[in-house]
């Protein structure tokens, strides 16, 4: 049995009552998931203390062992959810071998969650170039300096690599490295979840058999 001081206690009736959404209006009033997601993300941007666009990205390695990490959503539209990374990182290699992924957004301030599952495809070079150019110069230099996910001798070694790349580019442009780009998760399913008292949560599930099909909408038991 784990230390009961480490794990939060199970809420009692009074505690559950305090978690009730003050806005009792129906929040699943969209029949298109991307529009509903845009509504929720807009609300989260106003209430989350930081990084409302943070999402857990789950992939799997060649043996099928799952892997998960937090990344930042950088674009979303009817085609899917976009993030950027070093293509030579662990997630880059896993997605190259198995182009499928799952996402999870969890906004504590809203007591809401969105789960996404789907196929993964690379963004275009033009998209990657445009986003890379929008980043801070030091971040662009860092993308050249960091051999992401590979062993690092010391923090000093990283800082030396950053200084070397900064000197190499001088005052000139810092182009996008060939090993740095983005991926788009094209959903086959999305689930929208809202916390409700006594674990009687609201769940709305959107799914489709393929990317060209229309969405089926199903309310799920909690």
Curated annotation (Swiss-Prot):
An example molecular function term from Gene Ontology annotations: pyridoxamine phosphate oxidase activity
The protein's annotated pathway: Cofactor metabolism; pyridoxal 5'-phosphate salvage; pyridoxal 5'-phosphate from pyridoxamine 5'-phosphate: step 1/1; Cofactor metabolism; pyridoxal 5'-phosphate salvage; pyridoxal 5'-phosphate from pyridoxine 5'-phosphate: step 1/1
Record-level GO BP terms: pyridoxine biosynthetic process
Superkingdom in the source lineage: Bacteria
Cofactor note as given: Binds 1 FMN per subunit.
Keyword annotations: Flavoprotein, FMN, Oxidoreductase, Pyridoxine biosynthesis
EC class (word): oxidoreductase
Annotated binding of FMN, by residue: 69-74, 84-85, 91, 113, 148-149, 193, 203
Cofactor section: FMN
Physiological role: Catalyzes the oxidation of either pyridoxine 5'-phosphate (PNP) or pyridoxamine 5'-phosphate (PMP) into pyridoxal 5'-phosphate (PLP).
UniProt cross-references to NCBIfam families, sorted A to Z: pdxH, PRK05679.1
Record-given protein name: Pyridoxine/pyridoxamine 5'-phosphate oxidase
Species this chain originates from: Maricaulis maris (strain MCS10) (Caulobacter maris)
Species classification: Bacteria, Pseudomonadati, Pseudomonadota, Alphaproteobacteria, Maricaulales
Gene that specifies this protein: pdxH
């Amino acid at each position: 049995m784990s230390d009961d001081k480490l794990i939060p206690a199970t809420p009692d009736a009074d505690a559950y009552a305090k978690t009730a959404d003050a806005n009792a209006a129906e929040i699943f009033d969209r029949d298109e998931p991307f529009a509903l997601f845009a509504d929720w993300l807009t609300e989260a941007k106003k209430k989350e203390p930081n990084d409302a666009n943070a999402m857990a990205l789950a992939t799997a390695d060649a043996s099928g062992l799952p892997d998960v990490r937090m990344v930042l959503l950088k674009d979303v539209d009817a085609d899917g959810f976009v993030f950027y990374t070093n293509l030579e990182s662990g997630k880059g290699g896993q997605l190259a071998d198995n182009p499928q992924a799952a996402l999870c957004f969890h906004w504590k301030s809203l007591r809401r969650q969105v789960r996404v599952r789907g196929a993964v495809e690379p963004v275009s070079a033009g998209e990657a170039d445009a986003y890379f150019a929008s980043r801070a110069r030091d971040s662009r230099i860092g993308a050249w300096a960091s051999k992401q996910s590979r062993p690092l001798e010391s923090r000093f070694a990283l800082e030396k690599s950053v200084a070397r790349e900064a000197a190499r580019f001088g005052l000139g442009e810092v182009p996008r490295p060939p090993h740095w780009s983005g991926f788009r998760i094209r959903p086959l399913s999305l689930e929208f979840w809202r916390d409700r008292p006594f674990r009687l949560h609201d769940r709305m599930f959107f799914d489709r058999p393929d990317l060209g099909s229309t969405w089926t909408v199903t309310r799920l038991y909690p």
